[in-house]
Every structure is written in structure tokens, then in C-alpha cells.
């Protein structure tokens, strides 16, 4: 039997039940989920599914990541919610590919762990799966036999507990970018998962940080003193865009905006003064009318023991996020959110500053 797999949280419990129900029969897992976005999230879920399949001794095959096929299916349905026609089209894409893979492998049966998802309508899935199975002369397995509702009820109680016990990645959205946007909008929150960093950094509460956590956990799983997976809530930050201009219509100057710099409408700073800070032993630019602070690249090099030649080099090989927070703490305090901007060199000219940023609470995984 081939089992289409969507994620580890659904996967572990479902595969255990499948192995019990079909004892002695070979089970093949198939990870085909072109709806998952961004690609880094897809890879994170794939890595975790590999872990659960290894735990159970089940072979796992990976399908192609065909995002364009999903986007074609979702066209015109982007604004629909969960359990809508968009989800039905997504089922069609994934279950059709699963049926074709089962047929290719010579399997007679297939099913999907999506049946256990609390975000999906099992009746929609069953109808679609049976329709596709009939076209390919296959059987779509539902674990019914008058016990599917019991199976689903039991799963709802135990799914998250089993995931926590086995330290699996528990994603906070179904997978597609459209569902994520709708979910975040309903919570009045920004979809951080869809934001790419303006600098080459691994940011708190990012998919890249989650990947690091679970890879570290996986590498240490055989250690006697292995760390424990836990969650916490943090107040984190994203810089969306920003810059410094000599006039409203000029090209932006090379600059580096430090982490936790709050949003600024395009403010005009015409009283910029540079003073030598005895406390910091570097030049600092400030205005009596605005709280934005300026450092020169030379000042950054001094404070952070770096040797950047120019701002292009800094932006290509930036300070990591923690270093930026350390620099902020040195200059204006760890709790500060006033803009701090690094310029190539000191300037006495009038400057226009604009910053768009977001502060938001996020629940993150970490290791104890």
C-alpha cells in the first residue's frame, strides 16, 4: 500500500495505525506536497517526515516540488478559506499523483494522512480519493469498517501528545501561502513565514531558525545528554524596507538599518549633529528633533571588532541578528526601538529617513 504523507504530526500516528491494520504488508510513504510554501518550509517538513518514517522502518519516496501546478489549480480561488474549493483542487492534485505513483509501483491500494488533519474535511477527501482510485483501478483505503469516526476521535486526542513525545515539528499552518495569509489576517498578524530577510541573516521565528533547531536535535538524538525540545513566546522583529535619501527624489544612500529599528514615515532630518561619544569612543550622529541615531562604518568596526571596507561588504556579509542586538544595546540600550542607521561616512547634509518594520509575538521552538 502507498500512503501519501503531508506532515509528521499526522504521519506518525497514521502510519502506526496503518501498520497495525495491515500487518505484514509492505507500506511505502510518498511525500508529494507542491502546495507547501515557501520551499524552506517544504524542506523542513520533508526532513521531519523522513525522521518519522525511519522510526517506523517505512520506505519514503519524494515526489517533485511542482509549485506551478498547485498555483494553476488554485487560480481564481486564492481568497477562499479552509475546506473550500481550493482545498478540493489541492486534494485532486496530490491524490492523483499518489495514485499514479501507486500504479507505477504495482501497488493495489493507496490512502493519505490528510484524513487525520483537523483542518481538512475527511468526507471531501474520501470522495476525491475514491473517485481517483476508481479511474486507476485501485482501492482508496479509509480505515472505515465502522471505526473511522472512532479512529478520528482517538486521533484528535492523541495527535499532538504523540508529536510532543517524539519531538516532532508541529507546523502552525496547513501549507499553502493562501491559507497562511488568510489565517494571519484573521489574527491581525503578519505572515513572517512569507518574508525573506533583507539581509543574509537567520532571524528569530524564521523557518530557517526552526530548521536549525530540528537538525541540531536530530544530530544529538543518540547523545546521553541530548537537549530537550521546548517552546516559548518571543517578541520578534522584521525589517520590511527602509532607506536614507539626500532628497525625496534622489537615489537612496548605502546604509544598514539595525534590528529593532521602529517604523518611520519619510522624516526630514535637517539638524543632524555628530559628536564623539566618550562612552562609546566613536562618532554618533543625532538630531534634537528626531530619535534616529547614526553611526559610521568606522564606528561599527570599532564597536564590534570588525573590519568591513564598505557598506556593500557589510550588507553582503552582515552581522548576525544577535550581533546587531548587541550593537543596539551598546549604543542605546537593549530595550530601545529607536532607529539606528549605519552610514558609509559622516555627512552634514539634510537626510530623509523612511523605515517600515513589524514587531510581533511569535511562538518558537528551542532546545533546553
Curated annotation (Swiss-Prot):
The keyword Lipid biosynthesis does not apply. Its EC number is 1.17.99.6. GO terms for molecular function: 4 iron, 4 sulfur cluster binding; epoxyqueuosine reductase activity; metal ion binding. It catalyses: epoxyqueuosine(34) in tRNA + AH2 = queuosine(34) in tRNA + A + H2O. Disulfide bonds join 174-176. It holds the Pfam family QueH. [4Fe-4S] cluster binds at residues 6-7, 87, 90. InterPro entries: QueH. It is an enzyme of class 1 (oxidoreductase). Keywords: 4Fe-4S, Disulfide bond, Iron, Iron-sulfur, Metal-binding, Oxidoreductase, Queuosine biosynthesis, Redox-active center, tRNA processing. Pathway: tRNA modification; tRNA-queuosine biosynthesis. Catalyzes the conversion of epoxyqueuosine (oQ) to queuosine (Q), which is a hypermodified base found in the wobble positions of tRNA(Asp), tRNA(Asn), tRNA(His) and tRNA(Tyr). This is Epoxyqueuosine reductase QueH.
Amino acid at each position: 500500500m502507498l500512503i501519501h504523507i503531508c506532515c509528521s504530526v499526522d504521519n506518525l500516528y497514521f502510519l502506526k495505525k496503518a501498520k497495525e491494520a495491515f500487518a505484514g504488508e509492505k507500506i511505502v510513504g510518498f511525500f508529494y506536497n507542491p502546495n507547501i510554501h515557501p520551499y524552506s518550509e517544504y524542506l523542513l517538513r520533508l526532513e521531519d517526515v523522513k525522521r518519522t518514517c525511519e522510526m517506523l522502518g517505512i520506505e519514503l519516496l519524494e515526489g517533485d516540488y511542482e509549485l506551478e501546478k498547485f498555483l494553476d489549480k488554485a487560480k481564481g480561488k486564492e481568497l477562499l478559506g479552509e475546506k473550500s474549493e481550493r482545498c478540493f483542487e489541492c486534494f485532486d492534485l496530490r491524490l492523483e499523483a499518489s495514485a499514479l505513483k501507486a500504479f507505477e509501483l504495482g501497488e493495489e491500494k493507496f490512502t493519505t494522512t490528510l484524513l487525520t488533519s483537523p483542518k481538512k474535511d475527511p468526507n471531501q477527501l474520501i470522495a476525491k480519493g475514491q473517485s481517483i482510485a476508481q479511474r486507476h483501478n485501485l482501492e482508496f483505503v479509509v480505515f472505515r469498517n465502522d471505526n473511522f469516526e472512532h479512529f478520528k476521535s482517538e486521533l484528535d486526542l492523541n495527535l499532538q501528545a504523540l508529536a510532543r513525545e517524539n519531538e516532532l515539528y508541529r507546523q502552525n499552518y496547513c501549507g499553502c501561502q493562501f491559507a497562511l495569509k488568510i489565517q494571519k489576517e484573521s489574527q491581525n498578524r503578519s505572515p513572517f513565514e512569507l518574508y525573506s530577510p533583507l539581509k543574509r541573516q537567520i532571524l528569530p521565528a524564521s523557518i530557517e531558525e526552526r530548521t536549525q533547531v530540528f537538525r541540531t536535535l536530530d544530530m544529538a538524538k543518540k547523545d546521553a545528554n541530548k537537549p530537550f525540545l521546548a517552546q516559548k513566546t518571543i517578541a520578534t522583529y522584521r525589517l520590511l524596507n527602509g532607506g536614507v535619501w539626500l532628497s525625496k527624489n534622489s537615489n537612496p544612500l548605502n546604509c544598514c538599518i539595525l534590528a529593532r529599528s521602529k517604523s518611520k514615515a519619510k522624516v526630514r532630518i535637517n539638524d543632524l549633529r555628530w559628536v564623539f561619544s566618550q562612552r562609546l569612543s566613536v562618532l554618533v550622529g543625532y538630531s534634537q528633533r528626531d530619535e534616529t541615531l547614526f553611526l559610521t562604518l568606522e564606528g561599527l568596526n570599532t564597536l564590534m571588532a570588525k573590519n568591513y571596507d564598505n557598506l556593500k561588504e557589510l550588507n553582503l556579509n552582515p552581522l548576525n541578528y544577535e550581533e546587531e542586538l548587541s550593537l543596539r544595546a551598546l549604543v542605546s540600550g537593549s530595550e530601545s526601538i529607536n532607529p539606528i542607521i549605519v552610514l558609509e561616512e559622516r555627512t552634514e547634509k539634510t537626510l530623509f529617513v523612511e523605515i517600515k518594520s513589524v514587531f510581533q509575538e511569535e511562538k518558537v521552538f528551542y532546545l533546553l
